[in-house]
Amino acid sequence: MFTIVKRRELNPTVTELCIHAPLIAKKAKAGQFIIVRAKEDSERIPLTIAGFDREAGNVSIIFQVVGAGTMQLNSLKEGEAVHDFVGPLGKATEIEGLKNVCVVGGGVGCAIALPIAQALHEQGTKVTGIVGFRNKDLVILEDEFRACCDEFIIMTDDGSYGEKGVVTAPLEKKIVEGANFDEVITIGPLIMMKFVVKTTKPHNVKTVVSMNPIMVDGTGMCGGCRLTVGGQTKFACVDGPDFDGFEVDFDEAMHRGTMYKPFEAHAREAECNLLKQEVQ
């Protein structure tokens, strides 16, 4: 029984659920993920762990409502339970020994970036946080980032909050000015991570990307999350989700991400119709 103990809407399309899962909370580390099913007939959704409280036995997940599965998950209320909650899965982000790190997040990917920034801060690492959103209304987790970052920069596409522009602008400025980052860790849309890597590679700044492709079982059996990394096939669920950004084939990953769009659109429409019927 994985009960929802707290629910919070972070913006009009992004929701945080705090779920009682003591065994997962006991072992969870920053960068790992879970697979959740809202109901018995729901699709399996991989979501990176956004936070955990070992004493209370709670695990937080943050998701954007985009398809049928996340719509079903978003329909659950405090006191209700999700059907499945499996994890922690994947490898934790490697942060030991890092002294000066820039964490770059984009959109809902900031939910993944936050626990990594927090873990770095807790071990005494200097953390520069750069996050990007389309506009002011979509900004999430600002207070939480400010609490764990030595320097924090918000970028918005339209300039309605923070600075106007994309995350690569302040990142390149920091590198050119001699920030001397040990590593850049980036999580967000594939196109954003691709351009972060294009920014850091000429300066030879090690860059780790968190890959979150389509996934079914989370154990490497289905092969749905395969990626090409350094010319070899890797599976995000067991080999990742973190990879050397210099070696990831982003173009292939973006192409694979579009393969199921028609099916997702059909499932979303069907779920919308069901929700309308329930309201009526």
Explain the meaning of each model-derived region.
Residues 235-239, 243-280:
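Short Fe-S-cluster ligation motifs
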Residues 112, 190-191, 212-242, 270-276:
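Local cysteine-cluster metal-coordination motifs and their immediate loop/turn environment
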Residues 1-80:
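Ferredoxin-reductase
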Residues 42-51, 89-99, 237:
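Short, Lys/Arg- and Gly-enriched loop/turn segments at beta-strand edges
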Residues 6, 51, 154-156, 209, ...:
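Structural signal for conserved beta-strand scaffold positions within catalytic alpha/beta enzyme cores
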